[in-house]
Regions:
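N-terminal helicase ATP-binding lobe
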Residues: 1-772
Length: 772
């Protein structure tokens, strides 16, 4: 029952249309107009009180009352509404900043009552306090907290840890960046607790806090057959819903923990789930759900057209109002900038290109010279951000090494003079940036719920009610949709994407075949084609769900080669896995007693076990592994693993640049068709291929090659850590490599001291530096 159509019908009333246009475009209302529109708002609030499903009625009334406060400086209606619906932080802010000229005795009494909602140096909303209390006191094993972005999910996590202090606790997060941020936050609150963020840091503790991605959680379970988490907190739980591999293994990690401990408590936190049944993993699973349906923030939406006209959009009336004209998108962004500006694009290459173009129009800031020197000294003098950061701009995308990405994120958060962040979807998963205005330059593949999540990052609540603010303008964040053919594509007007925001209700799209309520019947019933031999009988695993059941319910049995391969998702690289599995099983038995095998390095072992003679099966689904047929490729990756652990970032980049120079000097064909991946590719690998995955290094300047080397380094590091590591884990599980070989691949050393330092949280590069 959205109600948006009922509101749109009021457009036919001229005074109503005129007043809404004024409120949308920031024009003060006359006394008669105020009286009329506030009366209309009261009617909508009364209808909402009759039926709480009519959330759009409340949202519209709140929009009007908030705008009246911000434009006409008439705060009494907002004060009264906030008191009635429990938006108590607004009441406290209005009272402390004296935004109402004279408070009645009743208002003073109400402020004293509001103080009862003080929690950890801030005032909570009524629903926020109620939900937090009920979630924490819940005896249910499965608890779901659904609330808009920045509505206290982090503080709820800390509370869950406090009431389970001496237990085994794990927070499951979707990205390595969130691991880093979570560790920093947890260390501040729980300085004496051991925090595990790598599966190898566990040392048989009875009580700990861990922060894992789903991949690390499963590796933790694989290495510790009996361990379980008493409490599992799944952050950004909407990541269970899509049809992708990471969603499937997230479901696997949750189910495995519950299988190992039937009394484990699970908490699911998300701003984007519509109803908890979408998360259902088992038929008997019952959720205790608490949800905040009302959003205290009401964004303003702007659209810049490529010809220069710009408009303001009212989502309730589905109307756009022309505001003016600007010469180009760069001038438009500069005209609408605030202290912290976030520009969103999709492609890593476009992220860099836009950063370059905007920086040409920005002036130098001498205060940032020292930061620029840090990047130059520790990364490379030709890294684009060395120049850009001096103008108050940084960019982020998946091709930047994690260490540098973490550093840049931290500096954007803490350094006031860095005003521009240009990035893609790497920021979608919970990173708490201090963003004051959002410019969206591309909406390709940006689903409506991800768009809402992105918008929710602007003006987090702790920034809205900061004592540094003199008003409540941050309750009304600015979101700009900026059209440009180069950055968004031809004939892709963002107006149509913006119109989707007029609704307040969005159904869950449950596509993960491991979930019970998946809507994707085709995937749900798709035959995996895997046969399992158990108790001398052959059993066909026909669906993804059956495959997951096989992995979960056989959890405590000895690891077979088959199960280990499936756990690592290596079965999916082969076209006919059943035939391949029989050959792999024979190789395992043969290599266990082979002197030839013992003399191979670990990369050669990967080749001889998983790749050799499987060209037909690999070329259909996993062509990237066929290059290991070449001895030089295997030699390259053997050396790369060593450099990855022992060289600094700067040394490694210089090594790659020397490699590029060598390719050029020796006229190697690879120099003019170098594989860099789809994100930065400009030409296809072979004629007729539609995918541009290669570059011609001979056409690139020294500076361009240095930045491509950075991407190259990140790509290769990810390939080792995600693709080759799966092979290494399997070989180790089935005892085809020694612990020393495993340690050298993972830690870069056989020395126990180095391994212990790594388990304490130090990187292999830092360990090498400290021991140099």
């Amino acid at each position: 029952m959205d109600g948006i159509n009922q509101i749109k019908k009021l457009k036919d009333i001229d005074p109503f249309q005129i007043i809404i246009r004024k409120l949308t475009t920031g024009v003060q209302l006359e006394y008669e107009e105020l009286s009329f529109i506030l009366s209309v708002s009261i009617l909508f609030l009364q209808e909402y009180q009759k039926d709480k499903r009519r959330i759009t009625y409340f949202n519209f009334a709140y929009f009007v009352i908030l705008k009246v406060a911000l434009i006409n400086k008439l705060y009494q209606p907002l004060f009264d509404l906030s008191l009635n619906v429990g938006f108590y932080p607004i009441n406290r802010f209005i009272y402390e900043k004296k935004l109402i000229e004279s408070f009645s005795l009743e208002s003073i009494k109400n402020d004293v009552e509001v103080d009862a909602y003080r929690y950890d140096k801030h005032i909570e909303m009524y629903q926020q306090r109620l939900n937090r209390t009920e979630i924490l006191s819940s005896e249910s094993l499965d608890n779901v907290y659904i609330a808009p972005t920045s509505f206290g999910k982090s503080s709820l996590i800390f509370d869950i840890i406090r009431i389970n202090y001496n237990k085994k606790i794990s927070i499951i997060v979707p990205s390595k960046s969130l691991i880093s941020q979570s560790i920093i936050d947890l260390k501040k609150i729980f300085p004496d607790r051991k925090i595990i963020f790598n599966e190898d840091m566990y040392d048989n503790e009875e009580s700990f806090i861990s922060v894992f991605t789903q991949e690390r959680a499963l590796r933790f379970f694989s290495k510790n057959k009996k361990i379980y988490f008493d409490v599992m907190i799944v952050d950004e739980a909407h990541n269970l819903l899509p049809n992708d591999y990471r969603a499937v293994i997230l479901a696997r990690a949750i189910r495995r923990n519950r299988f190992r401990s039937s009394n484990s408590k699970h908490y699911y936190l998300s701003p984007l789930i519509n109803e908890s049944k979408s998360l259902q993993l088992e038929a008997n699973q019952v959720f205790f759900e608490r949800k905040i349906k009302l959003n205290i923030k009401e964004p303003d939406y702007f659209e810049f057209k490529e010809m220069g006209d710009f408009f303001k959009y009212n989502r309730f009336l589905d109307e756009s109002y022309r505001l003016g004209w600007c010469e180009n998108l760069y001038e438009y962004i500069k005209y609408n900038q605030k202290n912290k500006n976030f520009i969103y694009l999709r492609s890593p290459k476009k992220v860099e290109e836009f950063s370059k173009r905007l920086c040409h129009r920005l002036g130098l800031n001498e205060k940032l010279a020292s930061l620029s020197k840090i990047l130059s000294d520790n990364l490379h003098e030709d890294f684009y951000c060395v120049d850009y950061i001096k103008k108050g701009l940084i960019y982020l995308h998946g091709g930047i090494p994690d260490l540098i990405k973490d550093f840049l994120e931290y500096k954007f958060e803490t350094e006031a003079d860095i005003k521009y962040l240009v990035a893609n979807s790497v920021v979608l998963e919970g990173i708490n940036f201090p963003i004051e205005v959002l410019f969206i330059l591309n909406t390709t593949d940006l689903r409506i719920k991800n768009l809402i999540n992105l918008i929710g990052r602007v003006n987090r609540l702790n920034e809205v009610f900061s004592n540094d603010n003199d008003d409540l303008l941050k309750l009304n964040p600015n979101v700009h949709f900026v059209n440009d053919t180069y950055f968004n594509g031809k004939n892709r007007d963002m107006y149509h994407k913006m119109k989707l925001l007029k609704s307040s209700l969005f159904e869950d799209s449950v596509e993960n075949p491991a979930l019970l309520n998946t809507i994707n019947d085709q995937l749900k019933n798709k035959n995996t084609g895997i046969n399992v031999v158990q108790d001398n009988s052959t059993e066909n695993i026909s669906t993804v769900r059956e495959l997951e059941d096989f992995l979960i319910y056989d959890d405590q049995k000895d690891n077979s080669l088959l199960k280990t391969i499936i756990e690592q998702d290596v079965h999916n690289i082969y076209n006919e896995f059943n035939q391949v599995h029989e050959i792999l099983f024979g190789r395992m038995e043969r290599y266990l007693i082979s002197s030839f095998w013992m003399g191979l390095n670990i990369i050669d072992k990967i080749y001889y076990f998983f790749i050799k003679d499987f060209d037909y099966d690999l070329k259909i689904k996993s062509k990237k592994f066929l290059r290991f047929n070449y001895k030089n490729t295997r030699k390259y990756y053997n050396n790369f693993v060593y450099r990855m652990h022992n060289l600094s970032l700067k040394s490694h980049i210089n090594h790659i640049l020397k490699y590029y120079d060598w390719l050029g000097r020796n006229n190697i064909s690879k120099y003019k068709k170098f594989y860099i991946g789809a994100g930065f590719g400009e030409i296809p690998y072979w004629s007729g291929n539609k995918n541009n995955t290669c570059i011609d290094l001979s056409l690139k300047s020294r500076k361009q090659r240095a930045n491509l080397a950075l991407v190259h380094l990140k790509n290769e590091t990810d390939f080792v850590n995600f693709d080759l590591l799966k092979f290494v884990n399997i070989l180790y599980e089935v005892k085809l490599i020694t612990e020393a070989e495993y340690n050298c691949f993972i830690y870069g050393s056989e020395q126990r001291e180095n391994i212990n330092l790594f388990k304490a949280g130090l990187s292999t590069q830092l360990i090498s530096f400290l021991k140099a």
